């Protein structure tokens, strides 16, 4: 199957500058293509993953992806999809973010048949006079104003800095066409104006016969109409320090039945046959959530590796069953990150006093005794029924944590100082 047909089946194509031309080109040869990301932060989130999943599919089909880190454009800000002016970052921030993004990209794309470039390398060498003389005359202001990317900002105002962003992105495409043999730019739906500005510039400077193309990806919406990419806690990051692999796994595991097949097509490399089989299980046995489980496994493995999948599944099973005593300290950090927690001293104490006075888990000594005697309290996975029992914070989990479960579902974490 042609790569464009494959992307279409997976729901990953929104607009193309020349569908038939691009299909013909990708049938004839392996092409260079690129997508860019500005270093506005030190980690990508799952929304950023969307265009790079498309690039990865091209790479797997033998094509040559180029990742553009926007060290130059990132220092001024892209108005795409923004209702107000971006806050400019210091160059130190930009360079720090560049290095973090590079390390993430290498994890996804490896080092073979893949290039990473930084537009700061060529944009920073261009003088203002060069910019105006060589490129400014080729851009019609009326055309630029008519593009959605700018028109949507005219009422609230847009600075000249952000207004010129589409020119800089066009220069990037031209540079990569001439120096990296790149013929296709990929971006989100809000990048259409910038991408077509780039193909127009190349045709003006290199001739209409230049074979360059643009392809945008649809805005991913969930079945409830909300934009895909965030959890209740905000962005779902690809950096394990910002969103733990367990949280990442749970995000995918909790996807709605109405969305899971779409996400399997988009975010996994499973075959058509396997996805269609999983789609059937959503209809016939939705309670088993096999499709969601496979989605969580595949995407977590791609971003964090197989070991992270096993760890996330171990944490999930322990929390569901209550058998937490076999968890490692690292797994507890992940699984209990968003649960109620309290700092405690590393000293032995009567369980009733510890639950009431030290941790405030129980509201009164009477309630604490009652819960203990009724078997409602578990410490580190073990049921405690003796009101005279002693808590030793250093006895489990490398002396770092005490896990309390009250009732069937209510967990608390005590962090040992």
Swiss-Prot record:
It comes from the Bacteria. It catalyses: tRNA(Tyr) + L-tyrosine + ATP = L-tyrosyl-tRNA(Tyr) + AMP + diphosphate + H(+). One of its GO terms (molecular function) is RNA binding. Gene3D superfamilies: HUPs (3.40.50.620), RNA-binding S4 domain (3.10.290.10), Tyrosyl-Transfer RNA Synthetase (1.10.240.10). ATP binds at residue 230. It is an enzyme of class 6 (ligase). InterPro entries: aa-tRNA-synth_I_CS, aa-tRNA-synth_Ic, Rossmann-like_a/b/a_fold, S4_RNA-bd, S4_RNA-bd_sf, SYY-like_C, Tyr-tRNA-ligase, Tyr-tRNA-ligase_bac-type. A motif ('HIGH' region) lies at residues 39-48. A motif ('KMSKS' region) lies at residues 227-231. Residues 349-417 form the S4 RNA-binding domain. Its EC number is 6.1.1.1. SUPFAM superfamilies: Alpha-L RNA-binding motif (SSF55174), Nucleotidylyl transferase (SSF52374). It is found in: Cytoplasm. The keyword Nucleotidyltransferase does not apply. L-tyrosine binds at residues 34, 165, 169. GO terms for cellular component: cytosol. One of its GO terms (biological process) is tyrosyl-tRNA aminoacylation. Pfam families: SYY_C-terminal (PF22421), tRNA-synt_1b (PF00579). Its main location: cytoplasm. Keywords: Aminoacyl-tRNA synthetase, ATP-binding, Cytoplasm, Ligase, Nucleotide-binding, Protein biosynthesis, RNA-binding. SMART domains: S4. Catalyzes the attachment of tyrosine to tRNA(Tyr) in a two-step reaction: tyrosine is first activated by ATP to form Tyr-AMP and then transferred to the acceptor end of tRNA(Tyr). Homodimer. Belongs to the class-I aminoacyl-tRNA synthetase family. TyrS type 1 subfamily. HAMAP family: Tyr_tRNA_synth_type1. This is Tyrosine--tRNA ligase. It comes from Pediococcus pentosaceus (strain ATCC 25745 / CCUG 21536 / LMG 10740 / 183-1w).
């Amino acid at each position: 199957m042609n790569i464009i047909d494959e992307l279409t089946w997976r729901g990953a194509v929104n607009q193309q500058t020349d569908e038939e031309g691009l299909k013909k080109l990708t049938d004839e040869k392996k092409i260079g293509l690129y997508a860019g990301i500005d270093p506005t932060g030190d980690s990508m989130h799952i929304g950023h993953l969307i265009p790079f999943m498309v690039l990865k599919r091209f790479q797997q089909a033998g094509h040559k992806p180029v990742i553009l880190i926007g060290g130059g454009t990132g220092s001024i800000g892209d108005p795409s999809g923004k209702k107000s002016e971006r806050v400019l970052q210091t160059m130190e921030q930009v360079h720090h973010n560049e290095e973090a993004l590079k390390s993430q990209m290498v994890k996804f794309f490896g080092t073979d048949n893949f290039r990473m470039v930084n537009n700061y390398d060529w944009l920073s060498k261009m003088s203002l006079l060069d910019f105006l003389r060589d490129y400014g005359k080729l851009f019609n202001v009326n055309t630029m104003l008519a593009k959605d990317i700018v028109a949507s900002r005219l009422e609230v105002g847009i600075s000249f800095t952000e207004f010129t962003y589409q020119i800089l992105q066009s220069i990037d495409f031209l540079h990569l066409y001439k120096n990296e043999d790149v013929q296709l730019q990929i971006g989100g739906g809000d990048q259409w104006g910038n991408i077509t500005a780039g193909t127009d510039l190349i045709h003006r400077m290199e001739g209409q016969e230049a074979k360059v193309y643009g392809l945008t990806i649809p805005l991913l919406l969930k079945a409830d109409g909300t934009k895909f990419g965030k959890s209740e806690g905000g962005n779902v990051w690809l950096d394990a320090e910002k969103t733990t692999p367990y949280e990442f796994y749970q995000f995918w595991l909790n996807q709605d039945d109405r969305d899971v097949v779409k996400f399997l097509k988009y975010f996994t490399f499973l075959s058509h046959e396997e996805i269609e089989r999983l789609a059937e299980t959503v209809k016939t046995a939705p309670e088993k959530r096999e499709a969601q489980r496979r989605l969580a496994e595949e995407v977590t493995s791609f971003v964090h590796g197989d070991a992270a999948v096993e760890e996330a599944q171990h944490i999930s099973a322990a929390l569901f069953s209550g058998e937490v005593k076999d968890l490692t300290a690292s797994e507890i950090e992940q699984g209990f990150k968003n649960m109620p927690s309290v700092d405690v001293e590393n000293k032995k104490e009567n369980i009733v006093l510890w639950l009431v006075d030290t941790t405030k888990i129980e509201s009164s000594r009477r309630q604490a005794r009652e819960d203990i005697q009724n078997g409602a309290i578990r410490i580190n996975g073990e049921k405690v029924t003796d009101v005279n029992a002693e808590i030793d914070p250093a006895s489990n989990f490398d002396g770092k944590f005490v896990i309390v479960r009250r009732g069937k579902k209510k967990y608390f974490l005590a962090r040992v100082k």
